[in-house]
Amino acid sequence: MRYDLTIESMEWSYSRLTAFEDCPYLWLQRYIFRIRGQSKFFAQYGSLMHSIMQQYLTGVLTKNELVPYYLTHFLTEITGKAPTQKIYQSYMEQGRQYLKTLSFPARKILKVEDEMHFEFAGHPFTGFLDLMSEDEDGKLYITDHKSRALKPRSNRSKPTQSDVELDKYLRQLYIYAHAVHALYGRYPDYLEFNCFRTNTWICEPFSIERMQEVEEWARDLIDRITSESKWNAHLEFWFCKHLCDVAEECEYEDLL
């Protein structure tokens, strides 16, 4: 069944686009039937770390308060079950170590967790920009905090799987780069990931050509979603069991 009229009135986001790529049936449940999902371990962990960095960058928490706050709230807010006890312990320790030695680049902070509404690919979009900053030379950076352990670009003649994954996640920052230009009058000079679990900073120069490619990807994907009628489920064990927030309402989960 198609839901053209409902879909055409939507405000889009990077996560709304990638949810369809993850699983069309998940997208149907979440955005058409509005099933209230239940965040799982990885999502809860990412939300806690984002909240802590927001509070630190806005002066609500001091550096000395970060680890005690983190440990206290990890125990109370991370209620989802980790895939294994080893992963649970690893994530807890990686977060603790990161916050213990936290060090952001010395730049002027312009925006923190900035809610943006803008047009992209001919459609209304929204997004939350984790951090926008400017260095002493006036170069503008937009930064996204990521729990995923992305790797810096290899610069090999043939892109590695890690390079392909990096480009996939950079789509989000290119969407935000368009928003920054629309709202603040200039494109960022650099797109940046703060991969906090591994304490890895990945910085990529902005490319107008790449942004145009992302815009075309978004436009094509929205067209696909609008014309979708089958809404097939992508049954993949790890995703369904540990990442999908509507799995408990999904009749396909028992097939795994």
Can you describe what each PLM-predicted range is?
Residues 1-256:
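RecB-family 4Fe-4S metal-dependent nuclease core
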